[in-house]
Amino acid sequence: LSINGTEDQPAKCGLAVADTATGMYIANGVLMALFNRERTGNGMAFEVSLFDSITEWMSYPAYYTEGAGKPLRRTGTRHATIAPYGPFRAGDGGVVFFGIQNEREWLALCEEVLGDTSLASDPRFHTNPQRMQNRDALETLIEQKFANFSADEVLERLEAASIANAHMNTVEAFLKHPQIH
């Protein structure tokens, strides 16, 4: 709860994170034991705890807090240290999720996705720290540009620009996904 939600309202995770982490480490332990048995002919025992598993998964917030001397802020669907990052509404009402992780992606977003090279040199957005300081204005500009496109068109542009992205689906849309049927 201390890292999820917004500054005003914490939020629980959508699933049992500690249980999922522990299951992942158990699966890895079984694979390691099978590999060891294949190589040496000997079995092996291992232990996994919920606490140890979630401790590993909490390493980023822990290292950030230790290194920065302050905890990560709860940022909702935003990222604590990257902008732009999160869900953005397109002109057809669909929601697209993406995050800019480096300078190449920032330039590609401005030029290839938004079609506005002036944003790349705008002093408010030139570096990631500046984009973080002016995040509200940047997100507004992005959604204004996206208003001219459907979610599918935005996704195509992001894909062509090699920017990690996803369409934000409802549970109903997920259940209709062709890979499920």
Model-derived regions: residue spans:
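Active-site-adjacent "lid/gating" segments in soluble enzymes
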Residues: 1-100, 108
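Histidine- and/or cysteine-centered catalytic micro-motif in compact active-site loops
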Residues: 51, 101-103, 168-171
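Aromatic-enriched alpha-helical interface/lid elements that frame and gate functional surfaces
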Residues: 84-161, 165
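A glycine-rich dinucleotide-binding beta-alpha-beta segment and adjacent secondary-structure elements
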Residues: 160-181
